[in-house]
Amino acid sequence: MSRLLLTLAITTTVGSLLSSNPAAAQVLPPAKRAERVEITKGPELELATDHLTIIRWTTNNPGGSDVHYGIVHYGTDRKDLNQTAKSPIRLNQGHPYTMFRVRMERLKPRTIYYYRVASEESNGKSDGVKSSVNTFTTPGPGERIVAYPKRD
């Protein structure tokens, strides 16, 4: 009898785990794209070493495709941003904004770099936002700049 009860308990538990839960099975529709996408914070330096830098910025766009890309065009000549770094970001449909972080590698120490940020959907369609040209300087060998989170 106890073996029968144990089998029944296991079957009921497994069955309830495998049965579909209509509420859990619902997939949220994509969030609505902002009418006019704008950079609301940044772009700003997050971290810099002699050979890599992370730039971060936030836009007011929570929607469109689920995956977006943060893009940084950069170079050592303000008029020739001939290098590109790109990082994917998965949108959080519950947030009214998207924060991008892009890592640029193989930089030279003690060098001034110019950069401009942009973002696009996974299909390559631009969000229509592009920053002005900004600048940062990489520190010397073994040095590091941590600009975020800000320290008081």
Where are these regions (language model features)?
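C-terminal segment of classical bacterial N-terminal signal peptides
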Residues: 14-22
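Bacterial N-terminal signal peptides that target proteins for export
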Residues: 1-9
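A generic membrane alpha-helix/interface feature
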Residues: 1, 20-21, 129
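Short, surface-exposed linear motifs at loops/turns and structural transition points
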Residues: 26-152
